[in-house]
């Protein structure tokens, strides 16, 4: 019987429907790339596929098999009787035990393909139990999709027992053997398989490229695997062959491509997350089974890539095949979708993540960036954009990011940097830390190792990460965080102050330069502003009459919370109940402290304070009532530039030295002047609002000898 493997004519309506679905804005698409249809284009001449019936072949679903996954021409390809060796000593360690999201199922590739409806016989000559044969690598059940491009269920599986086992799949498919997760058998187990075809798999380290390309051209087996030590990619033969015909380098570089994938998986995922190949400690053991990517013609939820329990499933397109099979695409950091999917498998569960909001999006791109940087150094490939959704490249944005960090240390990252480029800027900072003193990412590996022992981590702030960083290098990294505008809590700063300041200006490290460290200079510790811990301070806001003076939700304790998105605003109303100036903020530091000056962050609203007078009592005896008229206050310093309208970002900290070091416990901040907006209309709705005062942070600092 002859079958014509040509989908375009038979399924034009379905293809049109799917094309529309891909471009509808309401669709739930995982990534935004230029993805073509997942079905085979078949622009070449039609192929006559001859099927010799009889011999027990089930032909009942040939028409469906012709559509997907394809038919084997029985006059071209012959079935084989072969012995298959499997290492059943490989261990399956559940994802939960490794503190990751997903690990590969214990599935073995066989290099064999079952023809549609053809009987496969598997013989087990010993008492081995716990094995299952799967025919068809496309395990997704697409029942909920309508219309569909293939039958919803195209796989068949059967448990294997000692002796002779038979199985057939009316649609055919690649043959996998899955081991029960708790089985630990012989390293040299052998089974016999009869009636299958050899698939033209490429196996790194054993396949000859020239012979392989010839096999691709002559066989009619429709699917194959590209296999390394840590990866196995199920791809369509015709699509791969078309790609090789267009670019023979794809085939020539296939050994290098799969070796690069193996290195990427082992280095950027396994080792990075503190997993080691073959580790005897199973909680630290990298998966023994390969990371699988299966290309399919259609995915659930109209996605074109998703994480399944057996691997990554991606749409069968030239774009995604190129991510898998092209050496240059991989080494230049353009295999974005596949790397992101692998990250979702190996990242920690959210409860154990150390990454705070300012950098969390950048962390996902670390493996891809490391691959691209390696490709730049080793092969000279220009780096991919890393964050294609930003619409700009790393090469364009990194210099801007470094210029931002190098300007000064009065920064506020989430306010200064546009949201669309924050991941690139944050990634630049993480790369700099990875190369501090030539550490080469070792700190991150140690961080991930430590996390495994934690039940949960508070990543609402950067404190956990910051403390771990300081402990690892035995240095205080506050200057680095300040240059990048990352918020630090007083607790974190106090903790780090036991270490000497970092001695290298690593924020000058330029990752893409020929000599990245050439601009890194020594960082002088003299003159650094060490901030006092304000955790025990008490603060009161009072008006000229001694009454509480703050607006709802904007109490004065917000000035001490290390969060510039909050702050104090004095009470106001639309009538005369807005209290008259001057206003006062009274601070009890709870102990007499050496103070060299104050820092504060302004407010860019119309209520921003314009003048602050910092005072302290002449007598530092215990004060029970800050309104006591017998207390004599003396001025230390006057600040009148906090709300200057031309300052680029008045929410960044500014530091003000005292004329000389003071020993103080109590401070009073006097605000005698109207706010910076002198354009309030004398109407009922705005009258007296010129009195309102507001700023976001206040604290004191000291110098170390």
Language model segments and positions:
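Beta-strand-enriched, solvent-exposed domains that form extended recognition/catalytic surfaces
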Residues: 40-200
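Beta-sandwich interaction modules
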Residues: 152-176, 637-677
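Exposed low-complexity, polar/acidic, P/S/T/G-rich flexible segments that act as propeptides
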Residues: 181-229, 677-705
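Active-site-proximal alpha-helical
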Residues: 233, 395-493
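Aromatic, loop-rich ligand-recognition surfaces of beta-strand-rich domains
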Residues: 563-630, 650-705
